């Protein structure tokens, strides 16, 4: 939710981090009475630290659907999804979902009953970052999600958009 993005709530079962500012592109453009083109519906909220995304966000309730993981169509408010929608976040959540699926198969349980401690242990052993321990520079409050995506070679990509360039 927006509360998680802005740090007023913390996920107690994280499977990855996101960090992009919450944004939503304009709904339409119109010409105002003075003849100026204006955007309507722009949303831009930033200035928060990287935040954890809950396992519960990628797993539908058992009474709704069994054994489905949704790392892209996850449960989030439309404002929070403006932050989560970045490809590096989807890649992290996809990896976490695959790890959870493997655990569910190995333990013969539905994904809703995967042992969270075992899942977190495996994600950490795979070098998944589940908790942000770094600091946010005051001149660059919107850290790019790509900084949180680490591969075995530690190669990362940085977007200029997040820094406002």
Ranges and model annotations:
Residues 155, 160:
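Surface-exposed loop and adjacent secondary-structure segments within mature catalytic domains
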Residues 1-125, 129, 133-150:
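Flavin (FAD/FMN)-binding glycine-rich loop and adjacent Rossmann-like elements that form
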């Amino acid at each position: 939710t927006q509360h998680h993005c802005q740090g007023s709530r913390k996920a107690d079962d994280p499977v990855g981090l996101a960090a992009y500012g919450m944004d939503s592109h304009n709904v339409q453009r119109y010409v105002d009475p003075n003849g100026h083109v204006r955007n309507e519906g722009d949303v831009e909220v930033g200035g928060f630290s990287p935040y954890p995304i809950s396992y519960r966000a990628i797993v539908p309730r058992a009474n709704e659907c069994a054994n489905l993981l949704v790392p892209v169509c996850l449960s989030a408010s439309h404002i929070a999804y403006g932050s989560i929608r970045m490809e590096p976040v989807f890649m992290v959540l996809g990896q976490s979902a695959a790890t959870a699926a493997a655990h569910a198969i190995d333990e013969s349980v539905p994904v809703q009953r995967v042992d969270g401690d075992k899942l977190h242990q495996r994600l950490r052993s795979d070098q998944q970052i589940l908790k942000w321990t770094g600091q946010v520079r005051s001149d660059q409050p919107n850290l790019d999600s790509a900084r949180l995506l680490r591969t075995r070679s530690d190669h990362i990509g940085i977007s200029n958009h997040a820094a406002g360039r």
